[in-house]
Amino acid sequence: MASEGITEIDSGLIESNYDNVVYKFDDLNLKPNIVRGIFGYGYETPSAIQQRAILPITEGRDVLAQAQSGTGKTATFTISALQRIDENEKSTQALILAPTRELALQIKNVITSIGLYLNVTVHASIGGTSMSDDIEAFKSGVQIVVGTPGRVFDMIERRYFRTDKVKMFILDEADEMLSSGFKEQIYNIFRLLPETTQVVLLSATMPQDVLEVTTKFMNNPVRILVKKDELTLEGIKQYFINVEVEDYKFDCLVDLYDSISVTQAVIFCNTRSKVEFLTNKLREQKFTVSAIHADLPQGERDTIMKEFRSGSSRILISTDLLARGIDVQQVSLVINYDLPANKENYIHRIGRGGRFGRKGVAINFVTDKDVGMMREIEKFYSTQITEMPADIGSLFA
C-alpha cells in the first residue's frame, strides 16, 4: 500500500506516502466495542487525518501525522491504541506523551470515553500529582499510560513503570515535545523502550528540525502531512489591531469588549506577570475573569478550567500553557494580547476558536515593534491577517 514518494491526496490538501484512505469507521476493521465507543463519543464519519492515519497505525506502522488543532487527531491515536491493546495482557502496552498536564488529562478522558465498552485501563502519570497514586497504578497494572516526560521518566527510572511490554510510543504535539526543552527527556525514555516499539508522532506543525529528529526515532514511517498553506484552521477569521505601543493595549481591550457580544474568550499573554497584571486590571473594571499559568498548583488549574468550561467565567487569560490541546467548545474569540514569541505557537492559540468547523475569530494586538513578527507569522502559515474592520460588532452577530 505504501508508494515510493510523497503523493498528493484530496485535491492537494494533504500529502502522504500511504494511499489507503478509509471513509467509514465501519471499514477500518476495528473491534465492535471501539466502533460503539466512537459513535457514542459523537463521531459519525472519520476526519481527514483519521481516514489516513488510523489504518497504518493499527497495522503497526510508524506514522508521522500532521493535522491542525481541532481535526480529531487525539481520537486518531486513541482509536488506534485501543485497537492494538490486548485486553487480556495487564501490562503497559501503550505510552502516550504530551507536553502539558492539561493535555495529558484531556487525552486520558478521550481514551476513557471512546474505550468505554472495552476492558482497558488507562492512567495519567503527570507532574504535580501524588507520587503514591502513580506507584499504586503501576503496581496494579495499567495498559495505557498518558503522561508528561518528567514524571514518566521518573517512574521508569524508579522501576515502577516496566516498559518491556510497551509496543506503542505516541508523542502528541511533537513540535513542542521535540523542542530543546523536552528532547533529552524523550531520548532517555525512548532508550528504555523495546527496540520493536512502534512510534507515532502527531502535531499541528512539523518544522524541518523536527522532521530531521524523527529519523532517529522512526523506521520507514508513513507520512501524512498537511501542506503548510493549509495549516490555518478553516472558519477562523484573523485580524489585527495596531495599538502602536504596549501601554495602549488595555484601553483597546476594554473598548473592544464595549463593541462586541461574545459568550467566552481566551486571551493569551506571553508571561505569567502579564497574565496577573491583565487579570487584576480587568477585575477592577468588573469583568468576570479567570487566569491560568504553569506556576499555579495543579488542583487550582483544574478548578479554573472546570469553571471556564461550565461558563461561570467568560474570560480566560493564559500563557501558552493553554494553547496546546485544551478543548473548550464554547470559545468563539481568541485574543493575542501579545503575539506569541514562537510563531509555531500561533496556530495552537487560534485553534481554540473554532474546532471541527465551528466559526471563530482571532484578534491580534500588534504594537509597532510587533509588525515584523506578524509578517513572519503570515509568511510561515501562508495566510493573511487583515486589519480589524470598523464594524467589528457584525463579526459576532
From Swiss-Prot:
Span(s) of short sequence motif Q motif: 23-51
Sequence ranges assigned to domain Helicase C-terminal in this UniProt record: 255-396
Alphabetical UniProt keywords: ATP-binding, Cytoplasm, Helicase, Hydrolase, Initiation factor, Nucleotide-binding, Protein biosynthesis, RNA-binding
Localization of this protein: Cytoplasm
InterPro entries: DEAD/DEAH_box_helicase_dom (IPR011545), Helicase_ATP-bd (IPR014001), Helicase_C-like (IPR001650), P-loop_NTPase (IPR027417), RNA-helicase_DEAD-box_CS (IPR000629), RNA_helicase_DEAD_Q_motif (IPR014014)
UniProt cross-references to PROSITE patterns, sorted A to Z: DEAD_ATP_HELICASE, HELICASE_ATP_BIND_1, HELICASE_CTER, Q_MOTIF
GO molecular function, one term: ATP binding
Root EC class: hydrolase
Entry EC number(s): 3.6.4.13
Motif DEAD box, residue numbers: 172-175
Annotated ATP binding sites: A67, Q68, S69, G70, T71, G72, K73, T74
Subunit structure comment from the entry: Component of the eIF4F complex, which composition varies with external and internal environmental conditions. It is composed of at least eIF4A, eIF4E and eIF4G.
Function: ATP-dependent RNA helicase which is a subunit of the eIF4F complex involved in cap recognition and is required for mRNA binding to ribosome. In the current model of translation initiation, eIF4A unwinds RNA secondary structures in the 5'-UTR of mRNAs which is necessary to allow efficient binding of the small ribosomal subunit, and subsequent scanning for the initiator codon.
UniProt free text on domains: The Q motif is unique to and characteristic of the DEAD box family of RNA helicases and controls ATP binding and hydrolysis.
Family: Belongs to the DEAD box helicase family. eIF4A subfamily.
Name of the featured protein: ATP-dependent RNA helicase eIF4A
Source species: Lodderomyces elongisporus (strain ATCC 11503 / CBS 2605 / JCM 1781 / NBRC 1676 / NRRL YB-4239) (Yeast)
Chain's gene name: TIF1
